[in-house]
Amino acid sequence: MAYTPMIKQYKEIKEQNKDCILFFRLGDFYEMFFDDALIASKELEIVLTQRDCGENKKCPMCGIPYHVSDVYINKLVSKGYKVAICEQLEDPKLVKGLVKRGIIKIYTPATVIENENSDTGNFNYLMSISKKSNEVAISYIDISTGDVSYTNTTSDDIYKIIENEISKITPKEIIFNDHEFSTNSLETIASKFSIVLTTVNNGTDSIDFINSKITYDNTNSETTNICVANLLKYVFRYQDDLVHINSSRKYYINEFMEIDSNSVINLEIQKNLYTNSKNGSLFGVLNHTKTSMGSRLLHSYLERPLMDKEEILIRQNRVEEIFEDYELLVNLENCLDGIYDLDRLIAKLSYKSANAKDLIALKVSIEKIPYLKNLLNCNKKNVQLIGEKLDDLRDIYDLIDKSIVDDPPVILTEGNLIKPNFSNELDQLRYNRVNGKNELVEYEMSEKDRLGIKNLKIVFNKKLGYFIDVTKSNLNKVGEDYEKRQTLTNSSRFKTKQLEAIESKILDSEDEIFELEYKIFEDIRKIILENLSRIKKSADLIAIIDVSNSLAKCAYLNNYIKPDINTYGLIDVLESRHPIVELSVGQSEFITNDILIGSGKNDIQLITGPNMSGKSTYLRQVALICILNQIGSFVPATKANISIVDKIFTRIGSSDNLFKGESTFMVEMKEMSNIIKYATSNSLLVLDEIGRGTSTYDGLSLAWAIVEYISKDIKAKTLFATHYHELTELEKKLDNLINMKVDIKETNDSIIFLRKITRGSTDKSYGIEVAELAGMPKTLIKRAKSILKEIDKEDTKIDLPIADFAVQNEMEDDKNIHELKDFKDEIKNINVNEITPIQSLQLLNELVIKASKLGD
């Protein structure tokens, strides 16, 4: 088919960007054609129309105004589409024929900058992953804040490392080289977190490219260099001067508390389990921030709790100083409220997409900094230190205040941006325009008098410019100097040479004004760009104060206390509470529990009790309190002395991975294998109902062996909830294990959960009573009780002296190990060079006989 020149140009550009919806610039609109139009009209809910595309045929078309394109781009990208921006690369006024066009940007889920109406308290991370053998490198950036972070590590289980990092960072998009990875493995992880995967090719100039963009440690491994280079190349593809992206931070995974991906989900750190929203999560409880920068920093705190005691204390002390001064807390809150997202504004300035309204938002935010500095100058050491570092950016405020009108338009090329008295040249052009319009008014009045047409009027529209409108009844009064340009039903429109002269004076002035205002705005934007690092530092400090104030308010509202920190492995908390659950049931209704675990004597708590009795709440609250401690927060308790924990692992509830065809039990065993492999004596393990996914004896045996292994080989602080009451015998066998139970009050026909965790054990599961509370039919409950009574009467319950068997088996295992070691040493000591062939055969026969006598 012979397309029109413009459609042919569109098709050629689209061919190079098949995976994108192409926004094709035509005048004041971005147009979409063919399949893109069908998709965009549906997703954006805009009118679908048609356009001639050649040979009298039409193609689907829809369009959006260019000056509001960011809204529509965000909508499409949030639904998983990529958007390519095809701009006019020449001024249509200066070109005859087809305007040259080309791609200037491609927006993907992680490379779009949200508009002012978006939830900018979230990060919008792009992640890059590279690997070689057992080394993996991970880098990530939120292009709207410009922060580049990267790490590398070696592991036999690379995909577990990747999954753990993804669960913390929650990127919108991951780029990787599919020659390095098992695509299926990455797809499984990405689908779990709803992340877009994009394949890229590794470059050959990694170090040179990185150094041309950011400050970077050149001693990193080749894998790390490739990873960071891929990240930056993806960001800088169509925009080479993003000045806000200029530095990088290397972090080490073991420098922070490690929270595996299951724990991030099970503990509801960032989102709740049921609606996947922030409400009902730990973040939701803590978040009283007033700025988007503060909200994102709080996310970062929860992603990576600290391990360094001194750093934790600095955060805690800031929170304490604000907590103890409620007036300061309220004043800080009021001052922070209304500060715009400075990180996003910096990014828009760097992208050269900031408009005059963005500069006013920057001015309004900077205006609050002197008040903030004054509040922080309060003789409180840690808070005051932030205030002293805070740049008031007065010069930038003054520049914007003197130059930009208070309520500017969004469009930058139609004037009304710059205040009077800022530019003499602009003031003169405006004076000329005013004179021209005065002259126009005088000409209209003189023509009314000269022709005797009282309703004659001079009107303007974009198509005709200025013209004289004369009603039909007065057309006979018009002179020969009137040149007709348009005939309407009730009037006609005319031009005269004098009107054209006045029009030229006005329009020439307006064109010059628009051009000059835009140039002045660009100059102002350039000056601000040169000071982005100063604005960024102030934004970071504002975020720190905002988070400190937020944590202080949370502590004030919820009656938290400042914990002491120890390094000898003890977690000792009085009247602890679950920070999330207590808000749903009410603090007065929540049953508190003391926590005492660690320091070698009671490293393992074996907890028995029925379902719904409060075991899981207790398990989770211990872990959450440790996390709160290490982000520098106060904790929900009356007193606390908490050791620094290096890792938190949880195995709570079933999580069948049907996508991979794995059963509950297989998933459970894989997770336990991971925990046993990576846990240390400084870790906290939260384990609920291990072994329940298989037969009773298999499950009991595995649970027993796991507890023993943790006790003897790992020595981690462990909360182990179980229905296997036989395991309580382990308290007699293991010095670092104690039995705990959930208190139950029994009546004649029901039970009451007291939700109090105390020393001791229970040998009843109360399963029938729980079923009754859950609303099972009374006839069914009655039948179940009858069956249980008969079982107890007939003593059909198997009495398994498992503790005796376990001890006996362990002794036999130890004996076998020693015999095998002696046998191995005997073989190693044979010198084959000093014996004859006959002796060799005799020795081999003896070894076979000895081997047959050894245990399995």
Swiss-Prot record:
GO terms for molecular function: ATP binding; ATP-dependent DNA damage sensor activity; damaged DNA binding; mismatched DNA binding. Keywords: ATP-binding, DNA damage, DNA repair, DNA-binding, Nucleotide-binding. One of its GO terms (cellular component) is cytosol. It comes from the Bacteria. GO terms for biological process: mismatch repair. ATP binds at G609, P610, N611, M612, S613, G614, K615, S616. This protein is involved in the repair of mismatches in DNA. It is possible that it carries out the mismatch recognition step. This protein has a weak ATPase activity. Belongs to the DNA mismatch repair MutS family. This is DNA mismatch repair protein MutS. The lineage of its organism: Bacteria, Bacillati, Bacillota, Tissierellia, Tissierellales. The gene is mutS.
